[in-house]
Amino acid sequence: MAYGSQLTLLSGGQSIIILLIVSFLAWRFRVWFRLRHIPGPLGASLTNFVRMSWVFTKKAHLIHQELHQKYGDVVRFGPNMVSISDPASIHIIYPMRKGLVKNDFYVPLRPYTRNRGAIPNVFTALDEDLHMKLKYPVASLFSLSNVSKFEVLVDEVLSVIDEQLDRRFASHGEIFDLTEWLQFFAFDVMGTMTFSKRYGFLEEGKDVGGMLNAIGQFMKQAAPVMQNPWLDRVLYKNRIADSLKRTPGSDIMKFVVAAINERQKSASEDEDFTKARKGKNDFLDEYIITQKKDSNIPPWFVTAWTISNVLAGSDSVGTVMKTTMYNLLTNPRTLEKLHAELVAANVSRPRPRWSEVHNLPYLDAVVQEALRVHPPFALPFERIVPEGGLHISGQYIPANTVIGASPYVVNRHKPTYGDDAELWRPERWLEGGPEVRKKRDDGLLTFGAGRRICLGKHIGIFEVKKLIPFLVLNYDISIVKPETFLAENEWFFRQSNLLAQIRRRPLESVEPNV
């Protein structure tokens, strides 16, 4: 009798296991079946771990591009994920109206705190109402007219990099990694704009306090699990994981919170805080003032706004600067052409004025081409297809499918940017009539598109248009070993090893040494 009962219980346990397995397989088949008409690699249609493995190679952008070349404009990247490559679909996936909301892909980009969990910001907020609450109070601070008020602060940092390049490298022809110094510049500008102080990256010629490394490690950790966001919660964003090993985001949060606490202390001790700093306000001042003026804005919004400046405000801009200089130096014809335009426009030396460089046609084309060939972000910007589904490039995408487009892939779409879309050629932005130019402009996905377009777009362009003319006018720069230049995709493009030599250009010099 006991033996029979044991057999019955065992059979019951086995039945439950079998039922669970069958249910899981049925669910997976249903997920696979609903997108069976979308072409793509078989393995990717079965599990998200395939596209996660692409990210681990640090060449996901190239894999994505090859898949679109093989399968077309609509490719299945995951069991429930579809990638689009045609710029004509941008307005459908990323409209100005409400419709396609963000998914958990963005959650790994939120720094974790034990008290508040993973803090969302303007970019990583999934809920549209929360996004607008975060964005609306500070959006005007990022307008081009307001950003240009920071020119005097950027000029201070330009003076520092000018002095350091002269003293360390130009005077004796030492070979150095230009990418490091461009990143130092971008971070010190971010520090000046956000906190009214530089952090000494340029003066010391190194990653002060390991902040750049912390940001890099944070992105390196986040990128793979963005393909499987549930892993982020299991591995990193919980109290147990955080107590065993602090995440790189913890160091970034510590840096930001310390800066905020210091400034808020000054604000609480000075009733006329806003008046005392009027005319000298940095972003952090404006964030604190904005929050204090509106009781409906919670204090943690200040942290969310500030962390956005630190995470995206230096790395993304640094990527554009590195891309621009690498391509100018490896394509000397374009460097000559840019230099000639700057000289003809009588741009000031050593520090160009924004009023002199903001509307130069060839400089504009150079910056646009840099944004096109190597956008700072190089994974698809994911959204959720709404009820009713979508028709894109002749394919029906059912509701609740995750859909997205990679800036790297879209920006190299040959029907839009020409058969030479793989090449650096700034002139493409100056060619064609109004309709052709508008098509190219509208197809550029570097800053995103629609209602969730990057808030810091104008800051990035402002910094790049200040720095690149400064370097081109004041220095003869020669690349030493172009083959050592390395670009790796860790959500942000990581660029390194742009080995160069520089010498000071005489004031009367008008020809670049190329």
Swiss-Prot record:
Family matches, as SUPFAM superfamilies: Cytochrome P450 (SSF48264)
This protein's source sits in the domain of life called: Eukaryota
Q: Decide whether keyword Iron is in the record.
A: yes
Topology in the lipid bilayer is annotated as: Single-pass membrane protein
- CDD domains recorded: CYP57A1-like
* Effect of disrupting the coding gene: Leads to the accumulation of stipitaldehyde.
User: Which pathway does this chain act in?
Assistant: Secondary metabolite biosynthesis
- Residues reported to bind heme: C454
Pfam families xref list: p450 (PF00067)
Where in or outside the cell it occurs: the entry states:
Membrane
Q: Which residues cross the membrane?
A: 7-27
Signal peptide limits:
none
Its EC number is: 1.-.-.-
Query: Which keywords, in A-to-Z order, does the entry hold?
Result: Glycoprotein, Heme, Iron, Membrane, Metal-binding, Monooxygenase, Oxidoreductase, Transmembrane, Transmembrane helix
An annotated GO cellular component of this protein is: membrane
Q: Which Gene3D superfamilies match?
A: Cytochrome P450
* Gene Ontology terms, MF aspect: heme binding; iron ion binding; monooxygenase activity; oxidoreductase activity, acting on paired donors, with incorporation or reduction of molecular oxygen
User: What cofactor does its activity depend on?
Assistant: heme
Task: Give the PANTHER family listed for this entry.
Answer: CYTOCHROME P450 (PTHR24305), CYTOCHROME P450 MONOOXYGENASE PKFB (PTHR24305:SF175)
Task: Describe the family membership recorded for this protein in Swiss-Prot or TrEMBL.
Answer: Belongs to the cytochrome P450 family.
Q: What is the annotated role of this protein in its UniProt record?
A: Cytochrome P450 monooxygenase; part of the gene cluster that mediates the biosynthesis of the tropolone class of fungal maleic anhydrides. The pathway begins with the synthesis of 3-methylorcinaldehyde by the non-reducing polyketide synthase (PKS) tropA. 3-methylorcinaldehyde is the substrate for the FAD-dependent monooxygenase tropB to yield a dearomatized hydroxycyclohexadione. The 2-oxoglutarate-dependent dioxygenase tropC then performs the oxidative ring expansion to provide the first tropolone metabolite stipitaldehyde.
Q: What is this protein called?
A: Cytochrome P450 monooxygenase tropD
Species of provenance: Talaromyces stipitatus (strain ATCC 10500 / CBS 375.48 / QM 6759 / NRRL 1006) (Penicillium stipitatum)
Give the organism's phylogenetic lineage: Eukaryota, Fungi, Dikarya, Ascomycota, Pezizomycotina
Gene name tied to this protein:
tropD
